[in-house]
Amino acid sequence: MRAERDRHTTAVAALLAAAGLLLGGCSSAASTTASTPGSASSDTVGSTAAQGPAAGGGPSSAAAAASASGTPAGDARPGVTALEPLPAAVPTALAPYYGQKLSWQPCDDGFECTTFKVPLDYAHPEGGDLVLSAVRAPALPADPGSGPGSAGAGRLGSLLLNPGGPGGSAVEYVEAAASSFDSGVRARYDLVGLDPRGVGRSSPVTCLNGERMDAYTAVDITPDDQAEIDALVAADKEFAEGCRRQAGDRLGHLGTVEAARDMDVLRALVGDERLNYVGKSYGTFLGATYAGLFPSRTGRIVLDGAMDPSLDSLGGNRTQAGGFETAWAAFAKDCAKREDCPLGRTEQQAGEQLTALFQAVDARPLPTADSGRRLTEAQATTGVIQAMYADFLWPRLRTALADAKAGDGTGLLKLSDSYYDRGADGSYPNLMFANMAVNCLDLPAPFGGPADVQRAVPDFEQSSPRFGRDMAWMALTCSYWPVRATGSAHTVRAAGAAPIVVVGTTRDPATPYAWAQALAGQLESGRLLTYDGDGHTAYGRRDACVDGAVNRYLLGGDAPENGKRCGA
């Protein structure tokens, strides 16, 4: 939706929703008490979107990197080229960054924190630096009774984690989720979280204060007349201008390619020859980008809840709308079987009653228990979408919908607030601001203005009768972004890389299963692991088949056979 890619510590919530924010300028995050690695286990969970010759040694954007290859890779769409690797040798101009010494200091109740520098612009490293923050959970003593290959085995180095977004804090994610990782993985890896540039503790981008964000999340995203269109455009312009004013030059250097290059600097600084990595949602796009740029430095890579980098922003947003429709159908089918379902006794009735509820809230926003705030249609839609990220939120959604039909919008507003990780004091974290900044830089805007959106709405509604119109208008923000996109759609082959495990969930709302199939097919060494189930992402959600396959790979390098299926 509007800025999402996961914590009852702001970490896991913002991280899991962030793990799946909406493409049009959003990905998603969630508020949870993580009980398993990288999975949603609390109130919120998260969509994403992704993405010249450099003195620093190669392209500083996906577009520049892809331009090196004039031939589409594999079954790429017309005009979509391959992301080409950077030179294997570290350029002289970047040697000082790769030669830094990390100073890990105790922090945050049992963790270790550090900072290091990267160039603002890899094409011109002399032009100034950014300071990035990382945290690690040092490897624990092996438990002889733990999982595959753990007891007595040697250390494997660092395992870099990213929860998604873009905009999810990997620092917060590691601190929230480290204790839930497999004991064998914890015994052989330091778990490391790097907040990407512009995110969390790494030179974070901010755009609006809490009061203005409340207004932004409430604005009508299904405008019925010119006045409502003008109000939506004004809100998008205010958001974009706030980012420009407060971020300055950084706004043009927050792309995924640059973030992947930052990860390579950290890989070298922790002393690893190859990067080992688990990325979720948008984190899969970041990890795939790393593999494409540095295939010879790619170690054991797990991409869970995968994005398809060959999609442009229009195609990505439209297919993502279809993903949420699929998730809604699963919810509606389940709801219709339950006594407390407030939407009727058939899937068709559930859809009709949800549409009627949205229309009623659009005409007359509902009162809530939150200091005079009223629930708007935009927030009602966001609340429903939030619950599609994980089926453990479905009971809460049933209650919220029943309350809304009775005239109380409190439950849906709380779900909407958890999507954005809004604090009880009315403040918002950096998540949504970074989400928009990265998405609008990685891909050209899908629309030039409101007229383009209006023309596209029928196609979006065909993909998603429930959410298509909303998600088309949500994608308008990047049309007013003050910085031109530097990236473009591309395939990622990562020729010569070790096996890369791509995990897809069949009814994933934020990253549709077809995206995982596409990414696994693009990667020369891709191995598709399928989880037949609901919710966003699969690893760490207590499916023994998925968790066992991923843990065996991380611990012993034994990648699952391509096409392996788990779940129902």
PLM region descriptions:
Residues 169, 261, 279-291:
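Glycine-rich nucleophile elbow surrounding the catalytic serine of serine-hydrolase chemistry
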Residues 2-10, 14, 27-221, 227, ...:
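Catalytic-loop region of hydrolases
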Residues 532-538:
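Histidine-bearing beta->alpha loop at or near hydrolase active sites
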Residues 270-282:
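Alpha/beta-hydrolase fold nucleophile elbow
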Residues 84, 351-498, 542:
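Alpha/beta-hydrolase fold active-site neighborhood
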Residues 509-514:
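Conserved alpha/beta-hydrolase "acid-adjacent" motif
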Residues 22-25:
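C-terminal motif of bacterial Sec signal peptides marking the signal peptidase cleavage site
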Residues 206-218, 289-352, 399-414, 418-424:
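A catalytic-pocket lid/entrance helix-loop region that shapes and gates access to the active site
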